[in-house]
């Protein structure tokens, strides 16, 4: 008991952050949204776990993404879900609405849990570097930012990549600080980097970025003797980090044990064949295109982040650059954050496949600059104390809550008030993922004799598992003798689709 009390005393701030992050994401977690890719990821999780437990390790090379981290999380979630189902309900049909939502909850819950674990460790580092007040502002900024909130509640890889990349750089920076070199934090950075690379190929940026990080940390005065010592430190520490990272990648992806060449070939195809060449359909500024161009991500930053984050992060970047030239004072972590944002956006802009969620890994770094600006501003007015910071954090939370509570749990519908919210944003770049399905399936299920209705929807539709009746694809209309009782169409595209099918 004494050990627990001491542990809580030492880490109570991190413990509170951990639970706030998780609890805020729990309401309707298994009932709100089946994201567009969720059925595919559920299938991939099944393939991965089946291959893993049958000893068919080559079969764990399921997709080019490669999504290995998500499939590990999903595999564990399925086991826990099955255990609880047996204890609470006995045998349950996972294709039934209740069975599906139960499993869906556990799959997403363990994603949220993983995010919270790595974010909490990162907050520990921030607290050691900048103090409690800075960390509190950062936590509130990031945790309740609508775009990050939305993607941290779905069965997908982007929030994982975001948190793991940021955590990896924080752990490595903290572990390599002069007088504080800690191999434990370097190894933890390697683990986070490996899990990020195993999630999505855009995480490969972590390799050159970590080298750059070490250069920023170790390079000091520019004389021959110190340069030689610094470069030795960089080479030794980078090789250590690099080898540990590759070891984690190898250990956590069984396909590499038995068919490394094919596995790496498939991974590379995901970069060159899909990411660079394939593109993705958009209605960008009212024009249909597969590549919205170089301005896509800067405009996405403006229309998808909250005004508070946009203004404060922009001011923070300006303040940082001003400080560098005016006072020759450089915060190395902020310098690295600026490098990351610039190189990541440059890398992603060079590919033809562009999506709003691909900007997600930059959010923690923008939040860092926003927090920096607020902390400097409060210091200037001599109000950098707990009551004032708590008040500012409360304002940020209240602002974000007011922006999203009307659309709960459809956080994906958030667009900045700079452009008039969703009504303005959808004409610039409409969200690629649907929302509002919960309201729709609740309405359909509430209709009289819902179980006997013949329902037609254009597939793929993502609320089918929650329906109490049988639904058909509209292409099957001519094949059924019974006429449809209800047709659910997504929009103008579906009317055009039906006209083509007569």
Segments (PLM) and residue ranges:
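Transmembrane-helix motifs of polytopic, lipid-linked glycan transferases
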Residues: 14, 19, 97, 101, ...
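Extracytosolic helix-loop segments that constitute the early lumenal/periplasmic catalytic or substrate-binding loops
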Residues: 24-27, 39-72, 76-95, 274-283
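Catalytic lumenal/periplasmic loop and adjoining terminal transmembrane helix
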Residues: 26-31, 254-257, 263-266, 270-271, ...
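Membrane-interface transmembrane helices that cradle and orient dolichyl/undecaprenyl
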Residues: 128-130, 168-186, 220, 326
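Hydrophobic/aromatic-rich transmembrane helices and adjacent perimembrane loops
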Residues: 151, 158-162, 196, 205, ...
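Transmembrane-lumen/periplasm boundary regions of multi-pass, lipid-linked membrane glycan transferases
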Residues: 24, 46-47, 66-73, 207-334, ...
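Short hydrophobic alpha-helices at membrane interfaces in multi-pass membrane enzymes
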Residues: 136, 174-194, 231, 340-341
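Short helix- or helix-capping micro-motifs
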Residues: 17-22, 138-143, 150, 170, ...
């Amino acid at each position: 008991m004494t050990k627990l009390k001491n542990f809580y005393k030492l880490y109570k701030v991190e413990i509170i952050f951990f639970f706030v992050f998780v609890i805020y994401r729990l309401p309707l977690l298994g009932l709100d949204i089946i994201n567009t890719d969720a059925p595919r990821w559920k299938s991939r999780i099944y393939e991965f776990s089946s291959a893993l437990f049958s000893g068919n390790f080559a079969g764990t090379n399921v997709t080019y993404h490669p999504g290995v981290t998500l499939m590990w999380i999903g595999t564990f979630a399925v086991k826990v879900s099955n255990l609880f189902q047996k204890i609470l309900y006995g045998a349950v049909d996972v294709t039934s609405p209740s069975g599906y939502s139960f499993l869906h909850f556990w799959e997403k819950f363990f994603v949220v849990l993983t995010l919270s674990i790595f974010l909490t460790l990162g907050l520990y580092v921030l607290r050691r570097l900048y103090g409690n007040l800075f960390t509190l502002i950062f936590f509130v900024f990031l945790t309740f930012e609508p775009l990050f909130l939305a993607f941290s509640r779905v069965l997908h890889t982007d929030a994982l990549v975001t948190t793991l990349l940021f955590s990896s750089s924080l752990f490595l920076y903290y572990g390599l600080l002069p007088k504080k070199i800690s191999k434990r934090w370097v190894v933890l950075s390697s683990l986070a980097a490996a899990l990020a690379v195993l999630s999505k190929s855009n995480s490969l940026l972590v390799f050159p970025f970590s080298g750059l990080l070490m250069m920023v940390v170790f390079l000091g005065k520019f004389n021959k003797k110190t340069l030689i010592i610094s470069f030795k430190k960089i080479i030794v520490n980078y090789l250590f980090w690099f080898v540990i990272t590759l070891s984690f990648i190898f250990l956590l992806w069984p396909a590499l044990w038995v068919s490394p060449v094919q596995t790496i070939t498939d991974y590379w195809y995901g970069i060159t064949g899909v990411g660079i060449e394939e593109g993705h359909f958009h209605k960008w500024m009212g024009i249909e295109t597969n590549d919205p161009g170089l301005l896509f991500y800067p405009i996405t930053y403006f229309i998808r982040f909250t005004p508070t984050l946009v203004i404060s992060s922009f001011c923070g970047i300006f303040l940082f650059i001003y400080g560098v030239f005016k006072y020759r004072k450089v915060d190395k972590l902020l310098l690295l954050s600026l490098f990351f944002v610039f190189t990541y956006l440059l890398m992603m802009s060079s590919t033809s496949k562009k999506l709003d969620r691909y900007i997600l890994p930059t959010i923690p770094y923008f939040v860092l600059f926003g927090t920096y600006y607020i902390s400097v501003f409060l210091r200037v007015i001599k109000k950098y104390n707990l009551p004032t910071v708590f008040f500012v954090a409360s304002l940020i939370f209240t602002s974000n809550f007011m922006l999203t509570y009307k659309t709960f749990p459809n956080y994906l519908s958030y667009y900045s008030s700079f452009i008039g919210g969703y009504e303005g944003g959808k004409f610039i770049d409409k969200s690629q993922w649907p929302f509002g399905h919960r309201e729709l399936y609740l309405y359909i299920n509430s209709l009289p004799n819902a179980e006997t209705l013949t329902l037609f929807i254009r597939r793929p539709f993502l609320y089918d598992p929650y329906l109490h009746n049988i639904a058909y694809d509209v292409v099957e209309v001519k094949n059924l003798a019974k006429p449809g009782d209800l047709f659910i169409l997504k929009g103008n595209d579906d009317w055009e689709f039906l006209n083509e099918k007569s």
